[in-house]
Curated annotation (Swiss-Prot):
Disulphide connectivity of cysteines: C52-C65, C61-C70
Comment field on protein domains: The presence of a 'disulfide through disulfide knot' structurally defines this protein as a knottin.
GO cellular component: extracellular region
Signal peptide limits: 1-26
Protein name: Hainantoxin-X-2
Organism: Cyriopagopus hainanus
Gene Ontology MF terms: calcium channel regulator activity; toxin activity
The keyword Lipoprotein is annotated on this UniProt entry: no
Compartments where located: Secreted
Length: 71
């Protein structure tokens, strides 16, 4: 009986440690992904009047690229 209880407690402890490791790993990668995300770059859009080159540029216009100028 004591062996069964010990086995269950040990299994729960191992499970808790694995959850902690996975959570820390996921949090670390989510911060890295957030820094590299194109969505972050979209929010930094070019202001109106700046030259633009259509869909191939790294940082898009805040509005629309029209006649090679952001509007």
């Amino acid at each position: 009986m004591k062996t069964a209880i010990f086995t269950v407690v040990l299994a729960l402890a191992v499970f808790a440690v694995l959850c902690l490791v996975v959570s820390t790993h996921a949090e670390r990668h989510s911060k890295t992904d957030m820094e590299d995300s194109p969505m972050i770059q979209e929010r930094k859009g070019l202001p109106p009047g700046k030259p633009c080159y259509g869909a191939t540029q790294k940082i898009p216009c805040c509005g629309v690229c029209s006649h090679n100028n952001c509007t």
